[in-house]
Structures are given as C-alpha cells and as structure tokens.
A protein has these predicted regions:
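Basic, helix-initiating cap at the start of DNA-binding domains
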Residues: 1-21, 25-30, 34, 47-54, ...
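Short hydrophobic clusters on alpha-helical segments that form packing/core surfaces
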Residues: 10-18, 56, 60, 84, ...
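Short hydrophobic/aromatic patch on the recognition helix
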Residues: 36-46
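Short, basic, alpha-helical segments at the C-terminal edge of helix-turn-helix-like DNA-binding modules
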Residues: 58-63, 71
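Hydrophobic alpha-helical connector segments
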Residues: 66-110, 114, 136
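Hydrophobic alpha-helical bundle segments that form small-molecule/ligand-binding pockets
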Residues: 111-161, 201-204
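C-terminal peripheral helix-coil segments that are non-catalytic and often amphipathic
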Residues: 153-208
Length: 208
C-alpha cells in the first residue's frame, strides 16, 4: 500500500502547483492528482481549499521578520514593508492569497497585530490607525501583483483606440515613451511608495 503524503508534502506541492497555475485555476482535485491521492484523502488533512490556503498564508507569514532593531515608527514600517515583500517574492501567488483572504490564521493575525503596534502611539484615531495599516498592506500586495503581471507580460499593452495617444492623453504619452510603465515593479518604485505612505502619515500627524 502506497504511503499517503504528509501535511508538509501537501503544502509544498500546493506551492508547486501555484507556481504553474493562476490562483483561479487551483483546485483540490488538481492538487490530489499531483500528489497521487484521492480528493477525499486530501480533505482529511484540509477540510476545504480555503483551509489549505489559510495554512499556506500562516506558514509564509511566520517567515516575515519583525524589524525589532529599528527605533522609530517610520523605520519600522519601512523595513517591515520590505521584509513582507521579500516573503511575497518567495512564494507564488502569496500576494493574491493575502489580498483575497482576511487574516484568520495565527501568524497572519500576528503580522497585522505587529503592524498595529507600530502605529499604536501615533496621534491618530483608532479607525485611522486601522485604515493606515490596511492601506499599507494593500499597497505591498498590489505592488507584488503588478510586478508579477509585468514579468508575465513585459511588452507594453497596445492601445485599441484610433486617436493617437499623443493627442488623446498627452501627459500619459510622455511616460509611455519612457521606462516609467515597466519600472512600476522595480524596487525603486516599491520603496518610493513606502516612503510616500510614511510621509503621508507624518503629514496627518501634523494636521492632528
């Protein structure tokens, strides 16, 4: 009798499948086929696809290093943002998973909690602190998703409108002619975005 795959093997095979397929095409049936097991046996380990995804997010979240050596909230947010992005780069479709599924697993909840801890002493309302961290995470996720799309489709999209772009959208055309569009997924673009968010928080603190 063949040995049934372990939970760790199921998780590693899930990442392999996500490397090959978009998230929307992932299914428990395809995963079971890859592992050489029945779907019912797979459901013995994970009650649903959502439960499996929660486990993937949880294990990946554990690898995100908290910037304990940074002294200011600005530096902590900046470095933490880079650390989050680094882990997103290590796992296929993780950014989309974390965007699509709310923080319910232990380590994902801890990640959110540590981010809230960084801004806890700021002179903002609790609602605004929560909005800030939600925006911060969404920026990180969408930056990685945009980067993945640029890797998959490195060529600039072809406009379908008949009017020349230089006439239709002259300001956009200026950037279209340069590398601005393809540099959106660069580390420079990402770090600028982090700094922009942090500067915006500083501005709000002065207003308050």
């Amino acid at each position: 009798m063949a040995t049934q795959p372990t939970k760790d093997k199921i998780i590693s095979s899930s990442w392999e499948l996500l490397e090959e397929l978009p998230l929307t095409d992932f299914s428990m049936r395809k995963l079971a086929s890859r592992l050489g097991m029945t779907v019912s046996s797979l459901y013995y380990h994970f009650s649903s696809k959502e439960a499996l995804f929660a486990e993937l997010i949880d294990k990946a979240s554990l690898e995100i290093i908290f910037p304990a050596n940074e002294k200011t909230w600005q530096d902590r947010l900046f470095v933490y943002g880079k650390n989050i992005y680094s882990v997103l780069e290590a796992y296929p479709n993780l950014a989309q998973l974390m965007m699509d599924y709310p923080p319910e697993s232990e380590n994902y909840l801890r990640l959110f909690d540590k981010l809230l801890m960084i801004v806890d002493d700021l002179k903002l309302s609790d609602d605004h602190k929560f909005y800030t961290i939600n925006l911060f995470l969404n920026f990180i996720y969408t930056s990685k998703i945009d980067r993945d799309r640029l890797v998959e489709q490195p060529e600039k999209p072809v406009s379908t409108v008949k009017t020349p772009l230089v006439q239709l959208a002259p300001f956009l055309y200026k950037y279209w002619r340069t590398e601005s569009l393809t540099s959106l997924g660069s580390s420079e673009s990402f770090e600028f975005g982090l700094q922009l968010i942090i500067s915006g928080i500083e501005k709000m603190l002065k207003i308050n």
